[in-house]
């Protein structure tokens, strides 16, 4: 692929050559015609000035100052001495036609010119008589030798009829004299255009090199960014579109770098919190297992207490001994209830810590989402600038089209430049292709950012679920603590009843009934606690799953972050 410097140089050369061809064509057509018209106008004015000599001589004849012959000789003498533009002259012939007077070829004086023709077969003097009689004056084209030469040259003469004497006075312009004038003008213009063109090409060459360096710097930075290197920085200080691209690209890289740092930081935090959640879930499950074991113990002891109560009711003689057993069992039940309450409170503290950790993860996820949004916006800014470069490529294509039009105007001489102009259009299309490649790189960056954004959103949703589950677990633990406290109060009632049973045998029946009812209530409470423990075990398992999922997400983030070099 050709560099931008070579493309710009080729465009500059083609434009200069097109301008050169245009100047050449204009000088050989428009300027030639313009100079020819000016020369013809000068010839007309010169003939009219000489015509005044004839009028003056005729006036002298009319006044009687001179005879006609004298007046005509005076006019011929005066006109024969006039020269202009390096030996150009005037001649006089009549309407016969005969040569009246020719200052360069006097041997023609008095000759019949009706059969005189030039090498191209033009009866030039007959044409002069025809123009003079029909219009009084006009131009005639033919070939005639220059003074001091026998070679006929293309010539355009202006003739005018002097009716009083029947004379036709005329003078001519040699076409090759006009061509020499145009050639000198072409040489001067070619020299000027060449100097200017060389200067322009040199300027375009150096500008193209500067443009190429800027483009290579931007492309190199984009290639490094696409490979994950975020330590790059484009150093372009100009105030044109490339300077703006460099500024926006550096801002985008800075935002990407900040985003990756934030993601890396968040990943570490997510990994730490996921590990802590997993550890907390293990502690919670251990606590729930302890509570379950204690509940089983309480259930068994309550059953034992119920059996003892039945035995007490079946035999009053064993009341004293059984009441002591009941007191002992109730004491053990009270101690186990206290242990359960301690486990439940410890679970509450663990869940409070889990809520804080989940809130930290949620906040980090939101910050990461904000940074990703900023990076997306910067990528959109660079896409706008890339569209500006595409517009420049389109303008280059239009310039190539204009060069092709100018070459077409030059006709056969510019046919070769039409091919070059077509090549310029191809080069402009390659420039547009380069901008499309830049756009593709930006699209890859944006896809990566969007993927990170999706992962951040997923992280936020997961932390929301974790927080909801932890809060539900916390509420369930509150219920467990409340029920355990109620259970402890009921156990204290059982203890009081047992003491009353030991102290007063006469109240044994009523006390045993109260103990039986209370024991039944305790059994129900223990069953409810067991059900709550089962639910909490499910919640603890879900918390562990969330911790595992967060750990997996953290590993994925870590893999993405490790792709970048900060």
Curated annotation (Swiss-Prot):
Q: What is its main location?
A: membrane
Q: What is this protein called?
A: Methyl-accepting chemotaxis protein 4
What are the alphabetically sorted keywords of the record? Cell membrane, Chemotaxis, Membrane, Methylation, Transducer, Transmembrane, Transmembrane helix
GO cellular component terms, semicolon-separated: plasma membrane
What are the residue boundaries of the HAMP domain, all occurrences included?
A: 209-261
PTM annotation (Glutamate methyl ester (Glu)): residues:
310, 317, 506
Give this protein's Gene Ontology molecular function annotations: transmembrane signaling receptor activity
Organism this protein belongs to: Thermotoga maritima (strain ATCC 43589 / DSM 3109 / JCM 10099 / NBRC 100826 / MSB8)
- Where is the Methyl-accepting transducer domain positioned along the sequence? 280-516
Q: Which family does it belong to?
A: Belongs to the methyl-accepting chemotaxis (MCP) protein family.
Where Glutamate methyl ester (Gln) occurs, the residues are 499
Name the Pfam families for this protein: HAMP (PF00672), MCPsignal (PF00015), sCache_2 (PF17200)
Which SMART domains does this chain map to?
Answer: Cache_2 (SM01049), HAMP (SM00304), MA (SM00283)
InterPro entries, from UniProt?
Answer: Chemotax_Me-accpt_rcpt (IPR004090), HAMP_dom (IPR003660), MCPsignal_dom (IPR004089), sCache_2 (IPR033480)
Q: Which GO terms describe its biological process?
A: chemotaxis; signal transduction
**Is Protein biosynthesis there in the keyword field?**
no
User: What role does it play?
Assistant: Chemotactic-signal transducers respond to changes in the concentration of attractants and repellents in the environment, transduce a signal from the outside to the inside of the cell, and facilitate sensory adaptation through the variation of the level of methylation.
């Amino acid at each position: 692929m050709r560099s931008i410097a070579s493309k710009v140089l080729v465009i500059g050369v083609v434009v200069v050559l097109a301008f050169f061809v245009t100047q050449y064509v204009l000088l050989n057509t428009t300027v030639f015609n313009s100079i020819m018209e000016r020369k013809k106008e000068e010839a007309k004015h010169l003939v009219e000035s000489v015509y005044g000599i004839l009028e003056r001589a005729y006036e002298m004849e009319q006044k009687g100052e001179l005879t006609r012959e004298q007046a005509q000789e005076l006019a011929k003498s005066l006109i024969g001495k006039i020269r202009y533009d390096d030996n150009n002259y005037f001649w006089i012939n009549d309407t016969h036609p005969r040569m009246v007077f020719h200052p360069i070829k006097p041997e023609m004086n008095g000759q019949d010119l009706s059969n005189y023709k030039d090498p191209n077969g033009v009866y030039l003097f007959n044409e002069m008589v025809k123009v003079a009689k029909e219009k009084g004056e006009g131009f005639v084209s033919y070939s005639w030798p220059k003074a001091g030469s026998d070679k006929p040259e293309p010539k355009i003469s202006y003739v005018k009829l002097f009716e009083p004497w029947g004379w036709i006075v005329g003078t001519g312009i040699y076409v090759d004299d006009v061509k020499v004038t145009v050639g000198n003008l072409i040489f001067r213009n070619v020299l000027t255009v060449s100097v200017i063109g060389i200067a322009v090409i040199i300027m375009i060459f150096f500008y193209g090199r500067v443009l190429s360096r800027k483009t290579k710097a931007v492309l190199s930075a984009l290639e490094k960014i696409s490979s994950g290197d975020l330590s790059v920085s484009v150093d372009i200080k100009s105030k044109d579109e490339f300077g703006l691209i460099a500024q926006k690209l550096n801002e985008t890289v800075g935002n990407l770098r900040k985003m990756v740092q934030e993601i890396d930081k968040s990943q570490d935090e997510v990994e730490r919190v996921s590990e802590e959640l997993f550890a907390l879930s293990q502690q919670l499950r251990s606590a729930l297992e302890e509570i379950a074991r204690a509940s089983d113990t309480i259930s068994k002891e309550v059953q034992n207490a119920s059996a003892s109560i039945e035995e007490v009711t079946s035999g009053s003689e064993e009341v004293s001994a059984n009441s002591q057993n009941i007191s002992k069992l109730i004491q053990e039940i009270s101690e186990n209830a206290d242990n359960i309450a301690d486990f439940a409170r410890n679970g509450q503290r663990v869940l409070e810590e889990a809520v804080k950790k989940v809130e930290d993860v949620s906040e980090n996820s939101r910050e990461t989402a904000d940074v990703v949004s900023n990076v997306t916006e910067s990528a959109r800014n660079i896409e706008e600038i890339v569209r500006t470069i595409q517009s420049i490529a389109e303008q280059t294509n239009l310039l190539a089209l204009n060069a092709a039009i100018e070459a077409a105007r030059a006709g056969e001489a510019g046919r070769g430049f039409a091919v070059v102009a077509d090549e310029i259009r191809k080069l402009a299309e390659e420039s547009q292709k380069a901008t499309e490649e830049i756009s593709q790189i930006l699209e890859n960056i944006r896809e990566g950012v969007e993927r990170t954004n999706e992962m951040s959103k997923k992280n936020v949703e997961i932390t929301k679920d974790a927080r909801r589950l932890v809060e539900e677990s916390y509420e369930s633990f509150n219920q467990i603590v409340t029920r355990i406290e109620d259970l402890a109060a009921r156990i204290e009632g059982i203890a009081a009843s047992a003491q009353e049973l030991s102290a007063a045998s006469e109240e044994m029946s009523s006390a045993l009934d109260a103990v039986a009812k209370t024991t039944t209530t305790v059994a129900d409470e223990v069953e409810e606690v067991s059900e709550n423990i089962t639910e909490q075990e499910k919640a603890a398992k879900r918390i562990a799953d969330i911790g595992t999922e967060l750990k997996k997400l953290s590993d994925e983030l870590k893999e993405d972050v490790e792709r970048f070099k900060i």
